[in-house]
UniProtKB/Swiss-Prot annotation:
CDD domains in the cross-refs: KAZAL_FS
Organism: Podargus strigoides (Tawny frogmouth)
CC annotations in GO: extracellular region
Keyword Secreted: yes
UniProt GO molecular function: serine-type endopeptidase inhibitor activity
Record text about domains: Avian ovomucoid consists of three homologous, tandem Kazal family inhibitory domains.
Keyword Repeat included in the entry's annotation: yes
Disulfide bonds: C6-C36, C14-C33, C22-C54
Record site: Reactive bond 3: G16, D17
Listed name of the protein: Ovomucoid
InterPro entries per the UniProt record, alphabetical: Bifunctional_prot_inhibitor, Kazal_dom, Kazal_dom_sf
PROSITE patterns assigned to the protein according to its UniProt record, in alphabetical order: KAZAL_1, KAZAL_2
Superkingdom of source: Eukaryota
């Protein structure tokens, strides 16, 4: 199972890096920062499906 450490999030500003991750909501997040901010917003209900685009 793929996991991402989001313990340092949320971050107020995400860089523009493009390293896509696919969330359990079937949305593609452009990078770890955007994904982790969404995880925090979801109170931990959002998880990582896999690395790469959905």
């Amino acid at each position: 199972i793929a996991t991402v450490d989001c313990s340092d999030y949320p971050q107020p500003v995400c860089m523009g890096d493009y390293m896509p991750l696919c969330g359990s909501d079937s949305k593609t997040y452009s990078n770890k920062c955007n994904f982790c901010n969404a995880v925090v917003d979801s109170n931990g209900t959002l998880t990582l499906n896999h690395f790469g685009k959905c």
